[in-house]
């Protein structure tokens, strides 16, 4: 694969990413935070809303970047497997993206990574390789 050049995203890229992500998951809900409003001393007409990414298929916002990356690199990936290193949320996100795009995925994780992350990545079809960080 040729070396990828980086470029500053434009607003059109954001709109395209939103459309890609919407094909694979529902938007995360907004939750009003009364506690933060009170802590900040906000008036009656001022609100604080938090985006709850715990509702995504992997419980993290990282799935969105993984889905968009996979979509934008399908031609470069071709029939080859995708490999990634992560100890948690990105491992799950890229594994989910690979499942959605029917790509083989190999995840390298430290042995000390949370077991729930191993299980979730594997549930999406990831092949896991571990290493000892000591």
Regions found by a protein language model. Name each.
Residues 2-134:
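PLP-dependent amino-acid enzyme catalytic core
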């Amino acid at each position: 694969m040729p070396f990828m050049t980086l470029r500053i995203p434009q607003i059109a890229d954001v709109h395209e990413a939103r459309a890609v992500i919407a094909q694979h998951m529902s938007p995360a809900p907004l939750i009003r935070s009364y506690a933060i409003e009170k802590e900040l001393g906000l008036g009656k007409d001022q609100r604080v809303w938090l985006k709850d990414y715990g509702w995504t298929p992997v419980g993290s916002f990282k799935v969105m970047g993984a889905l968009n990356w996979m979509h934008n690199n399908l031609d470069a990936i071709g029939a080859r497997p995708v490999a990634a290193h992560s100890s948690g949320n990105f491992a799950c996100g890229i594994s989910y993206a690979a499942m959605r795009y029917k790509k083989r995925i190999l995840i390298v994780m430290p042995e000390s990574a949370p077991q729930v992350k191993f299980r979730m990545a594997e549930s999406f079809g990831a092949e896991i390789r571990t290493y000892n960080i000591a």
